[in-house]
Regions:
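Short, charged/polar connector segments at secondary-structure boundaries
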Residues: 1-101
Length: 101
């Protein structure tokens, strides 16, 4: 997977993103970025619109970052992008935390 560094303002939120990013979640992701660094890039289409990673982008903004790591999904057509957005959000909905960890 090729990862590029982009100015944060070139990474465009998807205007009909189905997932709401609560401030609490953004703060937790920001803390994770501060502690562990970037372990997952933001995935964008060839126009720079976010496919996956809205919360990571908001966390980067909260931290005042000027650049973010990005993977451009050159191999995905619009139907693939739509399907991936849906799948990525559904997987998150189907998971839960293990309080014993």
């Amino acid at each position: 997977m090729e990862i590029e560094t982009w100015p944060i303002d070139k990474v465009i939120p998807y205007d009909t993103n189905p997932r709401v990013c609560p401030e609490k979640a953004v703060a937790k992701v920001a803390e994770s970025l501060r502690t562990y660094g970037w372990r997952q890039p933001i995935v964008v289409d060839t126009e720079g619109v976010i496919i996956a990673g809205h919360t990571r982008r908001k966390a980067a903004e909260l931290l005042g970052l000027k650049t973010v790591p990005v993977h451009v999904a050159h191999d995905m057509d619009p139907d693939d992008v739509r399907a991936y957005r849906i799948a990525d959000n559904r997987v998150a909905e189907e998971t839960r935390g293990d309080k014993d960890l």
